[in-house]
């Protein structure tokens, strides 16, 4: 049975995250994709995603995988899916892969970007995709702090309390802060992420940008291995899964 790897983009604003869960309040991206697949194939398919994005988080390069008996040519899959998916979910690319391919477990690294709109006046067209902060932030200090997040660390301080994860070590290949006009971007590439990890990183960097913490506080926060030592969790709406590499 052929296995397909499909790249998706979606606006997560109206979804209770990627994963279908009994307690989910509202539709999920996985649920919408599964419903679209059933319409196309008649099969009950549970697509697997590279990143199980939270409620309100977006994606430009989410990757899913699934097996199907459908005889749709691989190059026609994006067009077929887009004909039955909601307007805020789009299939971008499809390729056939080995039967043992798994979108999550085969991923080598993921790139997330968090967007802050740093301006006194809000931008109504960006409000769903950025965190609006009126107070000017010290971007240079934030960039210095981000560099300390690179490398292999125990990121327990940057994991939401109550996470069932046992192993907190992750390898961060890149963590950087850049600015383009009123937009401040935090880009992070890692082999994996803990629950709310990127959003807690951003909340901590904003505390540094507000000069409530110094950049050199990051090593101590990492060493503490305590969620209480890091900053608040940034809103979901500014976060986007940009790309998954295999």
Swiss-Prot record:
Any one GO molecular-function label of the UniProt entry: tRNA pseudouridine(38-40) synthase activity
Organism: Moorella thermoacetica (strain ATCC 39073 / JCM 9320)
Stored Pfam families: PseudoU_synth_1
Top-rank taxon: Bacteria
Protein name, per record: tRNA pseudouridine synthase A
Disulfide bonds listed in the record: none
UniProt subunit comment: Homodimer.
Chain's role: Formation of pseudouridine at positions 38, 39 and 40 in the anticodon stem and loop of transfer RNAs.
GO biological process, one term: tRNA pseudouridine synthesis
């Amino acid at each position: 049975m052929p296995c397909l790897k499909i790249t998706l983009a979606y606006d997560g604003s109206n979804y209770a995250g990627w994963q279908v869960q009994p307690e989910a309040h509202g539709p999920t991206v996985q649920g919408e994709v599964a419903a679209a697949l059933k319409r196309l194939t008649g099969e009950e398919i549970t697509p697997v995603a590279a990143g199980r994005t939270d409620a309100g988080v977006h994606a430009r390069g989410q990757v899913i995988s699934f097996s199907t008996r459908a005889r749709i040519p691989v190059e026609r899959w994006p067009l077929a899916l887009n004909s039955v998916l909601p307007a805020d979910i789009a299939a971008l690319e499809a390729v056939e892969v080995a039967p043992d391919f798994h979108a999550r477990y085969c991923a080598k690294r993921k790139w997330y970007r968090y967007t802050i709109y740093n301006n006194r006046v809000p931008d109504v067209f960006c409000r769903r995709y950025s965190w609006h902060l009126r107070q000017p932030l010290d971007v240079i200090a934030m960039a210095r702090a981000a560099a300390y997040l690179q490398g292999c660390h125990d990121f327990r301080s940057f994991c939401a309390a109550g996470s069932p994860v046992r192993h907190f070590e992750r390898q961060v290949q890149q963590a950087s802060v850049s600015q383009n006009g009123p937009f401040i971007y935090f880009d992070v590439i890692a082999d994996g992420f803990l629950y709310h990890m990127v959003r807690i990183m951003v909340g901590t960097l904003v505390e540094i940008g507000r000069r409530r913490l110094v950049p050199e506080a990051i090593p101590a926060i990492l060493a503490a291995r305590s969620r209480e030592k890091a900053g608040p969790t940034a809103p979901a709406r500014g976060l986007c899964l940009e790309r998954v590499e295999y």
